[in-house]
Amino acid sequence: MFEGKEMRQVLCQFLDETMANDPKVVVIDADLAKANGTFNLRNKYPDRAIDVGIAEQNMASIAAGMASCGYKPFILSFTPFATRRICDQIAISICYAKQNVKIIGTDPGISAEFNGGTHMSMEDIGVLRSIPNLVIFEPVDAVQLYKSLPVILEYNGPVYIRMFRKVADPIFGDNYNFDLFKADIVKEGTDVTLLASGIMVKEALKASEILKNEGINVEIINVHTIKPLDEETILNSLRKTKACVVLENHNLIGGLYSAVSELLVEKLPMRITKIGVKDRFGEVGKMPYLKEVMGMTTEDVVEATKKAISYK
């Protein structure tokens, strides 16, 4: 269905289809419409595809105002500019006021590659997870993104979509059923649970093939919604396997690892291992290089998994 398609193309296909049928849907960019793929929407919907220039705070404030009048705004930028740069507007104008604004941050974490440390957001989930009334969602592939967008549009409230921008490794087929508030059991297993999000789901799958040859049966859960966390699916899996690794393309402070740790310390105390960015800024490089630098390779996952099992 989406073979070879970039995530931004899938997003724009949905927005185009939706704007054609719903005059209340609005897209607001901040000088990155070409990079995020929404530029051509201006020709078809010149009054509803808006570019505010390099003025992200205004983008968020305009969206909040339009939402208060019944519109359904989607705001887009690179992840650091869609989150930390407009944090106050997200907190007060959007979330405090419970406005129906969808915030899309593209190329999170190391997926920013060549834009360097200033354009790499390792902290966006940590910054936003503490803001009430906000759902945080990270689609794993094009199929999940496309199936999630109608659900997110219908959800009446603020949602942050942390989205890979280019071609993502396929995880799901066309028959995939999406539930915003239920994590996906991608692979069932009995020995250890790998809780992963975004680009790290593929690393979990690759590691599971290596571990399978060593007699280790891995369960993999795609935790696409980091807030609110699907506690039931996670706890059921960990009660079964009694071992856990958390994998995320984010700082290990404040993101999925922190959310899982907060859950387990209250409801299922256990020692777990983790893969992610170790409290540092990013740097320029292709993703394979950055994964190696950050300790996020398949081999790192294999090692962390064996360590988690040793804690049983």
Regions found by a protein language model. Give the residues of each.
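Thiamine diphosphate
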Residues: 1-162, 167-168, ...
